[in-house]
Amino acid sequence: LQNSLNFIDGLRIDRALKFVWQAAPQWTALSTLLLIIESVIPLATLYIFKLVVDHLTGTNASIESGSDFQSLSILIAAALGLAILSNLCNALLGYANEMQTHLVADHMQHLVQAKSINMDLAYYEHPKSYDKLHRAQREAPSRPLRIISGMTELALNSLTLVGAFALLLMFDWIVVIVVLAASIPVLIYRIKYAEALYQLHREKTASERLSRYFNEVITTAEKAKEVRAFGFGPLIANRFSEIRLMIRASLHLISGQAYRRQFITESTAAFAGYGALAFIVYATVQKSISLGETVMYFGAFQVAISSLRPTLSGLAKLYENNLFLSTLYEFLNVPKSVPDPLHPMAVPRPWRSGLRVENLSFHYPGTDRPILHDIVMTIRPGEIVALVGRNGSGKTTLTKLLCRLYDPDTGQITIDGTDLRNFKIEDLRGEISVVYQDFGRYHMTARENIMLGRPDIAPDDPSIVQAAQWAGIHDYLIRLPKGYDTVMSRTFADGEELSIGQWQKLALARAFVRDSQLILLDEPTSSFDATAEFEFFEKFREMARGRSALIISHRFSTVRLADRIYVLDAGHLIEQGNHEELLALDGVYADLYRQQASYYQDESQSVNNNNIPALSTAFSK
């Protein structure tokens, strides 16, 4: 069944043609016209040579003997004109194909990017999904280009071949049948090879991804410090080599078998072809055809043979490229698991009763382990809420559900009583600012990094500077050589490398520039020093005034600022209240607080013994 599906995919040339036409309709039309003209020129040239030979041998009655040189000059001039026209068409065709290539490659990349932008986060929970994405990314840039060049060569050779066969049919249809029949095994073997190659690449996708990952580990700056500090570069390089050796061994096995079959089938076709040529020679000896016709048929035979091999190869390559391109279609056709509603409602602005989580339960796709169980919580307008719990208790997962990166298994999340699933996803997320623990580090200017939080604002919008001031990164940025227009990476000219704490401040600025009604901060000061953390939260209430905020933190100096605190434990919401109420409850929150407080007390005692004030005591005041 799979082989049948692969064969059908390989024949779906219409999909590739559709992409090519969508990307470059004018250049495609021009290429088609030039191909038709260029395919006719060799046949017209052959006919002219026939007339020349017949004239020289006196067998062309249509040419008068008194004007030999003039007639020959006209024929030679016509042949020269066709040669110049062929050169012109060839040059224009090369230019048109180059324009097509760039346009189609960009179009295909745009399709992959557009699909990736709207892909549900759940898609990335499965290794097979990464395989699909890898295949789409690998094939999207190159396969359309190969299809364009392949279709160009195939069309040119096919049209030329048809014309050559038309001339040979004037001699004897047996010649055409013999040549075609001998070519069928060649085409079959090439198609089988394309299918085997395609199947191998599908089976080895995970291995190819792993080898690419190992290559990135030892060739990019991200892991460079640890690679050198621990000296494990050669180990990773060996792992890379082992995987590539395994992939090459499989490829060599398939290729070796294929090329043995190629030799046998093409040799058989050669015997048949030259047998047909001998038939033409025999007819000439028997004087069944004129010498001019012999030259024309010999030329037609040479054109047919020289066009037949690339035609068969082109058909097989087109089949192969369509097979590989089917991986792109497979990716583009992945359905959404978090869809927009058919009839979306407007997101309330301002929120009145706020956001409410009602009996929410959730587990990640592809797993059986529940992450959240029957969660009930409320975030009122203008309220700062903290979420506390041990690692793995489900805190970050809850923020993903609030942004509707996933939908709950049971229960619902509402804004002013309306389920989030009734809002257009883009509109909902436009009302939320979020900073995750694994915030993005974009190798763009500082200004552009902040503007990503609100792409519609102008580069000189004052809210950019205001957001940077709230995040505590403004003073650093204005001291850079190009200020806010400095690229945040040394991988580009005149760039600067940020510390992890500075990157986190830039991520906070990106969230604060957004005109949203809910701010979600997941460990927002995890990379701050004590002074920076203190200064940040001094400004936070001013920045968040009129907005709701949910803060996830393990630092109780941060948590105690909240109006209300929820405590998660193993996916269950077990406690809620303010700082004093939860301490009085003497439950999980109080236990976590005492553990952290004991550390600070020990630190404070150690520092005070040396008559040095502890910064950490500032957060207990």
Predicted regions and their residues:
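Membrane-spanning helices that line or support transport/gating and their immediate boundary helices
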Residues: 52-55, 91-99, 103, 107, ...
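Alpha-helical transmembrane segments of polytopic integral membrane proteins
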Residues: 10, 46-53, 109-113, 126, ...
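Cytosolic ends of transmembrane helices, especially the final helix of ABC transmembrane type-1 domains
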Residues: 232, 276, 297-333
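ABC-type nucleotide-binding domain
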Residues: 348-621
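Extended non-transmembrane interhelical loops and adjacent amphipathic helices
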Residues: 1-14, 101-145, 207-250, 322-335, ...
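Transmembrane helix-loop-helix hairpins at lipid-water interfaces of multipass membrane proteins
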Residues: 28-92, 165-197, 271-278, 282-298
